[in-house]
Amino acid sequence: MYISNLRLQNFRNIPAKSFDFKNSINFIVGKNGSGKTSILESIYFLSHSRSFRSSQLNRIINHNADEFIIYTKAYNPDEITISLSRKKNSNNISKLNLEIQKNHTEITRNLPIQLINPESFNIINSGAQQRCKVLDWGAFYLDKTFLKIWQQTKFLVKQRNSALKQNYPYSYILSIDKKLCEFAEILDYKRQAYFTKLKPKIYEILSHFNPNLQLDIDYFRGWNLHKSLAQVLEESFNYDNKYKVTNHGPHKADIVLSVSHKPIQDIFSRGQQKLLICALKLAQGEIHNSENDNKCIYLIDDITSELDSIHTLTLFNYLKQLKSQVFITTTEKNKINEFIDTNSYILEI
């Protein structure tokens, strides 16, 4: 997959603009506030039907307009068109090859995106939910049955929490538990299958960036490894009932990152953390590319942030050999001069 043309209308501070890109590394250069991150955001929005910058989508519409439109022409390898529009206080309207989509799933499958930006540090510094999203992104593309299992599991956890809050009888909770355990086991199996591929690939890429970095990467399924979920839910019912929330289950799954049993945020510097994030994201993209025909697109906001020149160059050279489409933003062209070659494309805004 690669994007050949992107058109934006009333998206953020871009009233109307068309951009052409190469199926290689595309540098977007501009001052702060020039709109370079908005270009990355629009591509991400096309894939995910949401922003990585704001949950208040009305704010994304240019203040002089009532609607934004994103349109792209891409190749996968055949030409496809994807568009997304949104009016104020309305829902997104997504189209794939001019056909309105009932949901965004097919577009997401057609447009796999990996984003590396300042908020990516949340994978390390925030709770398990952020790391669990890493597993779910990969499993979604690896296994077409994953989404329905994930949706059903999420629904059952929500239903159980609601029943706890409303003090439903224990017999009713048990009926939910029976279904939840069934779907949770399948979900765990699919996540583990993806993690088995992801872990060695992270180590491989990280050693390329910095062979001296040592860490442990483990998968936690969300409940005791030596007990069934049914047993854990039964044993923890009084605690769950007291706090009116389900404390064990697949919604608590995590990728545990540590050094000698200590959290890596207590050990790694910011630069080392960014190298790990890059290794993780690149690993996800490489696994995707090996399992699917359409290649992952990488969005990197401010590539030089937190990295010295040596590690920035190492990262860039790694990106170049992937032969995937990459979008990189920077505020200063002189910081990327040594990375530019005949295959690169530079957009100055």
From Swiss-Prot:
InterPro entries: DNA-binding_RecF (IPR001238), DNA-binding_RecF_CS (IPR018078), P-loop_NTPase (IPR027417), RecF/RecN/SMC_N (IPR003395), RecF_2 (IPR042174). Signal peptide: none annotated. Gene3D superfamilies: P-loop containing nucleotide triphosphate hydrolases, RecF/RecN/SMC, N-terminal domain. Keywords: ATP-binding, Cytoplasm, DNA damage, DNA repair, DNA replication, DNA-binding, Nucleotide-binding, SOS response. It is found in: Cytoplasm. One of its GO terms (biological process) is double-strand break repair. One of its GO terms (cellular component) is cytoplasm. The keyword DNA repair applies. ATP binds at G30, K31, N32, G33, S34, G35, K36, T37. GO terms for molecular function: ATP binding; single-stranded DNA binding. The RecF protein is involved in DNA metabolism; it is required for DNA replication and normal SOS inducibility. RecF binds preferentially to single-stranded, linear DNA. It also seems to bind ATP. Belongs to the RecF family. This is DNA replication and repair protein RecF. It comes from Francisella tularensis subsp. tularensis (strain SCHU S4 / Schu 4). The gene is recF.
